[in-house]
Amino acid sequence: QGNNVKTDNLSQIGHNVSIGNNCLICAQVGIAGSSRLGNNVVLGGQTGISDNILIGDNVITGGATKVLSNVPSGKIMLGYPATSMDKQIESYKALRKLPNLVKQFADLKKIISKKR
């Protein structure tokens, strides 16, 4: 474990895990065996990291993020599975449009079926 690492309560750090300097591990985080955290990493509460994962320097994960693959340095990751914050926001915006798209699709199906 590196210098100046803060670990909150109810966190589980597996065997052979390497943690860099200046890391913050919030409550209820689980890090599976042989994973490696770079320097200045912040893991939000209930983040889960699969085994043998490399987390680069200056990475932040949002609460309840599940990391299933390596994360390059400087990324902000959210969700399950973990994706970059930009992609997660894009997905959220698209999801808000879904009810209207479903209605439009149903309307188009009615129009097409009437023309047959």
Question: What name fits each language-model region?
Answer:
Residues Q1-S84:
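Structural signal for interior beta-strand "rungs" in well-ordered beta-sheet cores
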